[in-house]
Amino acid sequence: MPLFQTVAQAVAEVGDKFPLNGYVFQDMKGAETRYGYQEVARLTSQRAAAMQRMGLRKGDRVGLVVIEPEDFVLTFLAAVRIGVVPVPLYPPLSFGALDAYADRTRKVLGLSQARVLFASEKLQNVLWSLVDAVPTLERLVCVETLRDAQGAATFPPIEPEDIAFLQYTSGSTADPKGVVVTHASLIANCHAIIVQGLEKGKGDGVAVSWLPLYHDMGLIGFVIATITHGMTSVFIPTMRFIKKPSVWMDAIHRHRGTVSFAPNFAYALVSRKCTEEELASWDLSCMEAFGCGAEPIHPDTARGFIELFSTRARMDPRAFLPAYGMAEATLAISFKPLRETFRTRVIDLELFQETGTARDPRDGALTLEHVSCGPTFEDHEVAAFGDSGERLPEGVEGELRLRGPSVCRGYYNNPEATDAAFRDGWLHTGDLGYVLDGEVYVTGRLKDLIILNGRNVHPQAIEWVVGSVPGVRQGNVVAFSRPGRDSEELVVVLETKELDHDTLKTEVARAVRKELGVPPADVVCLSPGNLPKTSSGKLQRRKTRSQYLTGELGRDGTRTMGASGDAITVARHMARSLWSRAKASVLGA
């Protein structure tokens, strides 16, 4: 039985149950500020009172573009306590694609009908123009001004079926869709994660995270799941981790962390970047769960991380915990069982490509390896379905569908998208995979599947092979198909720092042909930072394919990381923002 019925109730009462636990926030230099949960209740009440003085009421939507974890968490929870619905938005990653960023942010604020945008002070000169661009948006508020808020809020009744917040999807190929996350689905999923998955729930355990808080894994997993179960949570600024990955393990070591989650790339990055001295200084025997999800899990990455940190930093090798989840299921769907060994299944590649059946390999056959994401949580069910809607037997690949109390209500003000994804009593995930011996194996995305000469080829398998070729930036490879004369052809796009592209292309083509029996028709080499990515760092295959087909791939305007940007574009956005800000001041907004 969950401790609380709503997140609002948890924020108000958890400090009385677990007075010694709370949130710890690091700044970019590593200095830490700690708030016990009783202090969190007081601070969020003050911020909520300030929101009510602005005229915000239960059911209103507000945007959050907040860089600092402390301001984000306290403002988010303040809104939730009074029934104001937060809409988390990512900050601009660079000025290289500012037009696209402003367009998406405008769309999300418009679709959610947000009344107020809370933003970090350093972003205001770029964001103020949105006040004019979004009809419902009344003002932009510097989130730092809420630090001095006084008074106590008046708390309306919050029910389990009330909306807690809206989680907007990346929207790389269409308008973003706002997943409606209720208090009921949050409480159900957080209970499944903490109690069933991690065997916690009585204030025990310490969570450590560097994940962005505007995405579901960071927000639900480390802000909401922890406070609803009285756990302490330590927050590292995302950019601090990106600049120096070892700060993640430092924080776990010092705080005696027990749980942390990250995508596959982070485990590869920290394994690559940590030094011998750092490894020798860490004692990670405290860790019970190094969760891995949000993107395909590479078996070699997992094995490398387990080997390095179990032998050099005293980590329990069973702590590595593959997981499966998605925003429409609130967050998590399945976990590898705690204290069990990480498992994979090696199958016959040709048989799988031709029939979709996962079977042991025949003698001499090419093979494919899939990571088990464990069984689904109690009261939840995952099954694979075929193209005609038939439920498939175990070990046969199809679209994964889910049902259970963690499934969200639908998409905000988008009945067409809701009806397409939430129907027949199931959430249609769009993911490909199979269930075998009660465990979930995720093989890819339905829309990304490549069909070559009648064989189903998963882009992840190609990308992993290419990523192992010396000179290729691991985790920065995209595979897709293009129209050929008689059938689809394979294209591989990669990032590299190498100057000899011709030799690298030859090596890539040879590796793919040898390991998977599929010859690429084209291999494209890009300099670092040119592959399209989402705000959470996920590669965008369909956008990459679209840019490839239109000849836009690799142009300066499409750079996603490390771009300096077009000075004219930046100046234009700042001028619009300054004009909007001046006009609002004159009008008294």
Tell me what each language-model feature is.
Residues 53, 81-150, 263-264, 269, ...:
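Structural core segment of the AMP-binding/adenylate-forming
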Residues 19-21, 150-168, 174-175, 180, ...:
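Conserved pre-ATP/AMP-binding loop-to-beta segment of ANL
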Residues 23-69, 73-77, 94-103, 155-157, ...:
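Conserved AMP-binding/adenylate-forming core of the ANL superfamily
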Residues 253, 260, 404, 409-410, ...:
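AMP-binding/adenylate-forming catalytic core of the ANL superfamily
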Residues 9-35, 164-166, 173, 325, ...:
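AMP-dependent adenylate-forming
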Residues 288-290, 297-439, 447-449:
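Conserved AMP-binding/adenylate-forming
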